[in-house]
Amino acid sequence: MDTSYPREDPRAPSSRKADAAAHTALSMGTPGPTPRDHMLWSVFSTMYLNLCCLGFLALVHSVKARDQKMAGNLEAARQYGSKAKCYNILAAMWTLVPPLLLLGLVVTGALHLSKLAKDSAAFFSTKFDEEDYN
């Protein structure tokens, strides 16, 4: 009893031309880079507690992007990752721009007040004679 594999007669003529015509290989090209989920950036944006909870929205979309990437749906993962990136950028802008504007207002206000104080000091240092009161 012969149980060896393959169970073909090695002396039989092979039809390589028929096999080559029956099988076709399709090359789709190299897959693109894996989508980014921006998870770490979203976690830090969430921890900073910025305006309108944009960091939390970024974290939600980052988790969805990671889930879709693990499921193999790369296009949905790219879309969720892109939304997470946009929310992170908005959160960073809402976090950085108002304090910078406030700092600019304080500096310009201080400069303006120092100029007013300088002008008013000259006014109060004026000495009047007794003849001026008559």
Curated annotation (Swiss-Prot):
Tagged with keyword Acetylation: no
Signal peptide positions on this chain: none
Known outcome of mutating residue 86 to A: No effect on location at the cell membrane. Abolishes palmitoylation
Effect of inactivating the gene: Embryonic lethality, leading to the birth of only 7% homozygous mutant pups, instead of the expected 25%. Only two out of eight pups were female. Crossing homozygous mice gave rise to about one sixth of the normal litter size, and many newborns died within 48 hours after birth. Homozygous newborns display no striking phenotype other than smaller bones and especially shorter long bones, and this phenotype persists into adulthood. The radius, ulna and tibia are frequently bent in newborns, but this is no longer the case in young adults.
Extracellular side: 1-39, 110-134
Topology of the protein relative to the lipid bilayer: Multi-pass membrane protein
Localization (cell): Cell membrane
Gene Ontology biological-process entries: bone mineralization; bone morphogenesis; in utero embryonic development; regulation of bone mineralization; response to rapamycin; response to tacrolimus; skeletal system development
Lipid moiety-binding region (S-palmitoyl cysteine): 52-53, 86
Family note: Belongs to the CD225/Dispanin family.
Its biological purpose: Required for normal bone mineralization.
Protein name (Swiss-Prot/TrEMBL): Interferon-induced transmembrane protein 5
